[in-house]
């Protein structure tokens, strides 16, 4: 994958996360979302955070959550955990639901 392709796909991930948080905040959630360049910080009502950031040199997207740090690479049309193969949006859904205490579903 070229650098241009990576950036387009990775930026689409950040945009999808932003859209999901906007929709969730219209409902029962109160998630503070801050974007600083290629880093998104989601802060939940209980003060816990999830950070999603791009790693262009490695062509990866990373998640830092209470559950740990996770690296995702674009494989066969999806962002997959480099260790477990878990799909990015499925994993983010699990981490955010655990930290928010309310269900929230992320998708592309």
From Swiss-Prot:
GO terms for biological process: iron-sulfur cluster assembly. It comes from the Bacteria. GO terms for molecular function: ferric iron binding; ferrous iron binding. One of its GO terms (cellular component) is cytosol. Keywords: Iron, Metal-binding. Pfam families: Frataxin_Cyay. NCBIfam families: FeS_CyaY (TIGR03421). PANTHER family: FRATAXIN (PTHR16821), FRATAXIN, MITOCHONDRIAL (PTHR16821:SF2). Involved in iron-sulfur (Fe-S) cluster assembly. May act as a regulator of Fe-S biogenesis. Belongs to the frataxin family. This is Iron-sulfur cluster assembly protein CyaY. It comes from Burkholderia cenocepacia (strain ATCC BAA-245 / DSM 16553 / LMG 16656 / NCTC 13227 / J2315 / CF5610).
């Amino acid at each position: 994958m070229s650098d241009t392709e990576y950036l387009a796909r990775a930026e689409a991930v950040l945009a999808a996360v932003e859209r999901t948080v906007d929709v969730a905040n219209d409902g029962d959630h109160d998630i503070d979302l801050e974007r600083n360049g290629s880093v998104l910080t989601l802060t939940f009502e209980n003060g816990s955070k999830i950070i999603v950031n791009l790693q262009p040199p490695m062509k990866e997207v990373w998640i830092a959550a209470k559950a740990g740090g996770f690296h995702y690479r674009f494989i066969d049309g999806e962002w997959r955990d480099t260790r477990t193969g878990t799909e990015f949006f499925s994993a983010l859904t699990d981490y955010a639901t655990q930290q928010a205490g309310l269900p929230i579903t992320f998708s592309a």
